[in-house]
């Protein structure tokens, strides 16, 4: 069973140790859909506020801006590279083994870094190779590639061998895919990044990851407030409002604390300084077991991110419960 021995760093953000000994801050800044100057500004403000864990991906299209922000904060003496934990992800059109190292090198060049702290396989299924990140046929259907993620993983392991990244992991992998990958992996994944929030608590998958010594990072930890997906915003529920009032916190802070107390590292996305500050102020209180159970009962299992256009692909991860 994985030991979640937590150490305290700046801004009182705990860290968790990977199976390989490296450590990851248990809260980070998510940057999906944060573009250009917004992404750079958010990263700089986050670092000033005590964030040390920054999450991005090649698919987000903001690696260069994030890299510029990181360099600026290093140059002004706010942090050193060793203080930071930087994650990015391999996109689906580069799943062939021989494409993985070049893709990692491209992300490093974009970020202006010599190494990554964590490199993830963004999704278990592959898309047609080429420059188009979302390849589609004339009917608008996604074009699948038949590359097996087991092959992709060999390329990920080579990234470690070449010193391009300290750790490697997966994202959006289900329990069966994790088991199959571990059967052949020479370097085990240290992390699985999945959607985790009060609506989708992922208890069974998180438990499986823990038993396999795989840490979990939670994206969309606030669900999708104000979204157009038809998913009820549980942050406004009486349960969340009452718990927030008791702790003198916001419902969003309660939601993030809930994810954290499940031993999942939330990576909330924001480009608003006040919210970035609010999101890191979750380590000075604790939810009771009754409060955790009350929040747990709010879940319906609905996903914000379902990538439904790929639901018929061989390695689509969401066709089983977990």
Model-inferred region functions:
Residues 8-84, 98-102, 114, 221-226, ...:
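N-terminal binding-site loop/beta-alpha segment at the start of enzyme catalytic domains
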Residues 100-121, 158-162:
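CE4/NodB-like, metal-dependent polysaccharide N-deacetylase domain
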Residues 28, 55-58, 117-120, 169, ...:
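Residues embedded in well-ordered beta-strands within globular domains across many folds
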Residues 1-9:
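N-terminal amphipathic/basic-hydrophobic helices that include classical n-h-c signal peptides
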């Amino acid at each position: 069973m994985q030991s979640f021995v937590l150490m305290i760093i700046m801004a009182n953000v705990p860290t968790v140790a990977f199976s390989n000994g490296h450590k990851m801050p248990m809260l980070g800044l998510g940057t999906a859909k944060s573009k250009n100057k917004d992404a750079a500004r958010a990263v700089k403000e986050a670092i000033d506020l005590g964030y040390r864990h920054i999450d991005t991906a090649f698919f987000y299209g903001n690696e260069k801006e994030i890299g510029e922000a990181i360099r600026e904060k290093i140059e002004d003496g706010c942090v050193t590279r060793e203080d930071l934990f930087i994650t990015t992800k391999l996109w689906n059109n580069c799943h062939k083994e021989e494409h993985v190292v070049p893709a990692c090198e491209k992300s490093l060049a974009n970020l202006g870094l010599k190494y990554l702290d964590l490199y993830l396989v963004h999704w278990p299924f592959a898309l047609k190779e080429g420059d188009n990140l979302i390849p589609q046929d004339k009917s608008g259907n996604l074009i699948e590639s038949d590359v097996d993620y087991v092959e992709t993983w060999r390329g990920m392991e080579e990234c470690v061998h070449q010193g391009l990244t300290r750790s490697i992991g997966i994202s959006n992998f289900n329990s069966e895919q994790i088991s199959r990958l571990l059967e052949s992996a020479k370097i085990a994944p240290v992390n699985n990044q999945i959607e985790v929030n009060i609506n989708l608590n992922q208890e069974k998958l998180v438990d499986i990851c823990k038993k396999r010594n795989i840490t979990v990072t939670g994206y969309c930890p606030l669900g999708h407030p104000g979204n157009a997906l038809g998913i009820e915003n549980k942050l406004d529920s009486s349960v969340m409002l009452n718990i927030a009032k008791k702790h003198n916190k916001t419902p969003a802070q309660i939601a993030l604390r809930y994810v954290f107390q499940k031993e999942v590292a939330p990576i909330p996305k924001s480009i608003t300084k006040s919210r970035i500050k609010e999101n890191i102020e979750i380590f000075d209180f604790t939810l009771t077991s009754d409060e955790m159970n009350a929040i747990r009962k709010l879940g319906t299992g609905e996903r914000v991110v379902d990538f439904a256009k790929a639901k018929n692909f061989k390695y689509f991860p969401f066709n089983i419960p977990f």
